[in-house]
C-alpha cells in the first residue's frame, strides 16, 4: 500500500531533491517528437539582401526546461574528392551567422539547478526573419565535383551546452561580443536555400574584336636580308661620297631603313572574330561574325568549327592543385569559301545559349565558371574529315546499333545525347593547319532596359506608324499614276532599305519595285473564253477536248512572258540582316604563338573534359 501511494504522491524527501526533480524536465533525444524548419516561400529563388521569413517548429513529448534554440545562416563551398583527380576534399565557409531564438538572456546568471525557461508538452512555433548578406554571395549550384550551398540550420539543446568556443577570434574580443554556439545539440534541422547572384548583361561593356595575324616566315627572312644589304651599301656610300649623300641632322641610317621597310606591304593572313555584346541570357542567340583575309583561294566544306564552351576551374588554395574542366554546350560546323578575286570571306552565324546554362560565377574562392566562344579555322586549304567520338565508336563496333523499337522511344536526356556527338577539337588545336580565336561570354540573369535601348525602340515604333500611314495612302489611285514618279513615299521606302546593312556586298542594287506600272496583257485563254458564245456546240466540244490534250512546248522564236517588255526589270530577291550597325570598336590583337588558357589539353571525364596543364619539363599527360 505504501509503495502504491508513493508512486502517486511524491515523498517530501523526493520533492526536496532538486537534482532528481530537474532531471525529469531535462531535454533528451527521445523527448522531441519532431523538429524542423518551415519557410513561408520554400520554392523561391532568393537574391542577396532579401529577407527570409519562416518558423522553427518543435513538437515535444514531455515538458522541457532549460533549453536553447538557435538558428544559423551558413554559406560554404565544398570540393569533393575523386579517384581520377588530384584535388583533396575541402570546405570553405563564406559566412556563418547564428542567432538565439529561444533561451535565457546572456545577462541572467542563474544556477544550473534552477529553472530559467520551460516549454509544456505539445507543439511550439518560433517565427524568424533572416536577412541575406549582400557581399560574398555567389549562385548556389551542385556540379558533382563540388557545390556552393546556403542553408538555414536550427538546433536545440540544453542551456548548459550553449557556451563560448575556444577560438582565436573569441580570445581577442570582449566578453559581450564573443560568439556562442550550441555544442552537441540533441536535434538539428537544415533547410537548403536557392540563391542567385544577379548579373545585368546590359551593363557589361562591349567586347573588343579578336584579331589574329599571320605573316609568311619566308617574307620576314627576306626582309632581314634586304635590311642588312641596304645598311651596308649606305655605309659605303657615306665613306666615299660624304658630301653628296649626307643625311639630315638627327637622322641615322637605321631610321631610313625602317622607313623603307614600312613602305613595303607585307602579305598577311588575317582573321577577325566579332561578337556584338558581352553578355546574353539563357535561350538567346549569340551572333558571330568572322572576317577572313587570305593569300589564295580556299574551299573547305568543314573549314570552320564554332563551339560554345563552359570551363570550370577548381582551386585547392595557394599550396594546392588547380584543375580545369571543359564542357561543350553548342557546336557548329560551317564551310569556308574564300573569294578567288578578293581573297576575302565574311561568315555570319549564331549560337544559342542552352536552357540548362547557369550564370557566370567569378570571384569565388575555390571554384569559377566561365563561358567562351571558341572558333577553329582551317586556313591551310586542305580538307580534313571531321569524325565525332560517337562515329569513331560506331565504326569500331558496327554491331552496337539501336534496334527499330529503340529509335521511337522518347529520350529524356536528349540534350546530353546531342552533346555526345560533338567533335573533340583537342586534336585540331594541336594541328598547325587550324587557327584558334576565343572570346569570353557572360551568361547573366536579366537584362534591364536602358535609355539607349529605349530610344531605338521609340524610333522603331514611329517608323512603323509612318509606314502604316504610307501603306494606307498607297491605296489611292493617284499614287499609281506615272505623272509623279518621285513621290515622298517612294523616297521613304528607299531610305529604309538603304539603312539596312546587307550581309553580302551587292553592286547596282535596285529595290524590288518599279516606278512605272507595267501594262496589263490578258492571256490568250481569256479571249478564247469570251468568243465561245459565238461558236456552235460541236466547236465548243472540240476546244474542250483540245484543252485536255498535252500542251506543246512554245516555239523558240516566241518571246517569253518574262521578257515581253524590254524596259521592265525583273523582280530581284535580296537578303539582309535586320541588325543595327555598331560603331567601330578598337581591335584586340592576339598572337597565334601565345598559349591560350581556355584551350589546353584535356581528357574525357564524365562527359566533361579535364584540362591538364602542360609541363615544360615533361610532355606526358596525366
UniProtKB/Swiss-Prot annotation:
Name of the coding gene: RIM8
Region (Disordered): 210-261, 445-489, 529-622
Family: Belongs to the arrestin family. PalF/RIM8 subfamily.
Source taxonomy: Eukaryota, Fungi, Dikarya, Ascomycota, Saccharomycotina
Expression induction or repression: Induced at acidic pH.
Listed Polar residues bias regions: 477-486, 560-582
InterPro entries xref list: Arrestin-like_C, Arrestin-like_N, Arrestin_C-like, Arrestin_domain-protein, Ig_E-set
Native organism: Candida albicans (strain SC5314 / ATCC MYA-2876)
Pfam families in alphabetical order: Arrestin_C (PF02752), Arrestin_N (PF00339)
Biased composition (Basic and acidic residues): 535-545
Cellular-component GO terms for this entry: cytoplasm; cytosol; plasma membrane
Function summary: Required for the proteolytic cleavage of the transcription factor RIM101 in response to alkaline ambient pH. Required for hyphal development.
The name this protein goes by in its record: pH-response regulator protein palF/RIM8
Composition skew (Low complexity), residue ranges: 227-240, 451-476
Superkingdom in the source lineage: Eukaryota
GO molecular function annotation: protein-macromolecule adaptor activity; ubiquitin protein ligase binding
